[in-house]
């Protein structure tokens, strides 16, 4: 059973009673997932940019948006219009499929993994986690990468507060660390 199907059939009903809502449309849901990688020092190197684009598109299965500098910053050796990062916004079926792979395949492959921090919510029910290595994803072959680079994954929900967002992600199977 896919995560989207499980959400519609079991998780929604469970959250309806757990959070004591009167209407099924009040139950929080994941609206989008943003995967972002800043290039940092590698911004001057075109090979790193190409590698980041192919890695993120392999992981997410979607075309990558190259983020560019809005203004020149001499201290960071950045000119206006230079590529400084890559980002992907996932919605719909691709979002649920990515979330399922993240929870069931990628996160358990992290070395010394004891769960993700339950404190990484932003106050509005959105969750952000940083991944230090891209090789935790099964789509990335260890032999084909030139450097180990991380990424930021933001799970945006329409929950009103952190408790609702935490309850939603816990029901979806997000392995939160117990502090």
From Swiss-Prot:
A molecular-function term among this protein's GO annotations: rRNA binding
Summary of subunit composition and partner proteins: Part of the 50S ribosomal subunit; contacts the 5S rRNA.
InterPro entries on file: Ribosomal_uL5, Ribosomal_uL5_bac-type, Ribosomal_uL5_C, Ribosomal_uL5_CS, Ribosomal_uL5_dom_sf, Ribosomal_uL5_N
Primary role: Binds 5S rRNA, forms part of the central protuberance of the 50S subunit.
Entry keywords, A to Z: Organellar chromatophore, Plastid, Ribonucleoprotein, Ribosomal protein, RNA-binding, rRNA-binding
A Pfam match: Ribosomal_L5_C
Keyword RNA-binding: yes
Primary location group: plastid
HAMAP family according to UniProt: Ribosomal_uL5_B
Gene Ontology BP term (one): translation
Family the UniProt entry places it in: Belongs to the universal ribosomal protein uL5 family.
Gene3D superfamilies assigned: 3.30.1440.10
GO cellular component: organellar chromatophore; plastid; ribonucleoprotein complex; ribosome
Lineage: Eukaryota, Sar, Rhizaria, Cercozoa, Imbricatea
Localization (cell): Plastid, Organellar chromatophore
Name of this protein: Large ribosomal subunit protein uL5c
């Amino acid at each position: 059973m896919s995560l989207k199907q499980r959400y519609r059939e079991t998780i929604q009903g469970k959250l309806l009673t757990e959070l004591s809502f009167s209407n099924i449309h009040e139950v929080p849901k994941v609206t989008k997932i943003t995967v972002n990688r800043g290039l940092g020092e590698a911004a001057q190197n075109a090979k790193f940019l190409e590698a980041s684009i192919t890695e993120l598109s392999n992981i997410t299965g979607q075309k990558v948006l190259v983020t560019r500098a809005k203004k020149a910053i001499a201290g960071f050796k950045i000119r206006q219009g230079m590529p400084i990062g890559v980002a992907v916004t996932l919605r719909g079926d691709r979002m649920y499929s990515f979330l399922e792979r993240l929870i069931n395949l990628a996160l358990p492959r992290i070395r010394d993994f004891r769960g993700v921090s339950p404190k990484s919510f932003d106050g509005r029910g959105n969750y952000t986690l940083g991944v230090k290595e891209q090789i935790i994803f099964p789509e990335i072959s260890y032999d084909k990468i030139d450097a180990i680079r991380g990424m930021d994954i933001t799970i945006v929900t329409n929950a009103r507060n952190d408790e609702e967002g935490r309850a939603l992600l816990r029901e979806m199977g997000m392995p939160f660390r117990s502090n």
